[in-house]
Amino acid sequence: MNFCPKCSSAEIVKKIPEGDNRERDVCNKCEEIFYSNPNIVTGVLAYTDNDEILLCKRSIEPRHGYWTLPAGFLENQESIEEGALRETEEEAKLQVSDVKLFTVLSVPHIDQIYTFFTGKVVNYDFGPTPESSEVKLFKYDEIPWSELAFPSVIKTIKLFLEHGDDKIFNEVLRPKV
């Protein structure tokens, strides 16, 4: 942060504000405190009655060329479900029904929170988009595990295959040391 959005001062310093316990960006002129919060990623695990899930091959970084569930960053003024459905349309041209919250995954080492919903594939007119070079249904036993982009996607798919979507999972993912 270079300038205070409240008073336009360039006097932004890092310090622990009175009554707080974490270092924050603070304007030295007007004393405005600026909080940096985790980003929320939201998406959909889309499935069919034929034991298939939909995956998108990423055509953008990070993890270009790897498979993922359609997902992306939540925008201001949208609910996590609205964001998940928007991202699913943007990345796969897909609509889903019977949408249910499925996983909430905290990933503290990268300051992100992932929320995945499950949803039943409604239209089979899905296809590639600027963000996905390929969009494909995979039988459960044909999922390309070694080509999946992110631990959050792997965890969500494994939980779905083990438990179906009758339960909500709330877990923390940490890097292996």
Language model region names:
Residues 1-44:
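Acidic, metal-coordinating catalytic segment for phosphate/diphosphate chemistry
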Residues 16, 65, 147:
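Short glycine-/acidic-enriched loop or helix-start segments at secondary-structure transitions
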Residues 19, 61, 105-109, 176-177:
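A short beta-turn/loop motif at secondary-structure boundaries
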Residues 22-24, 52, 64, 112:
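A generic structural signal for beta-strand entry/edge sites
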Residues 31-101:
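Long, charge-rich boundary regions
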Residues 35-36, 139, 172-173:
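Short amphipathic beta-strand/extended segments with alternating polar/hydrophobic composition
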Residues 48, 74-159, 167-169:
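Unchanged
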Residues 163-177:
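Charged phosphate-binding loop/patch that engages nucleotide di/tri-phosphates or the phosphate backbone
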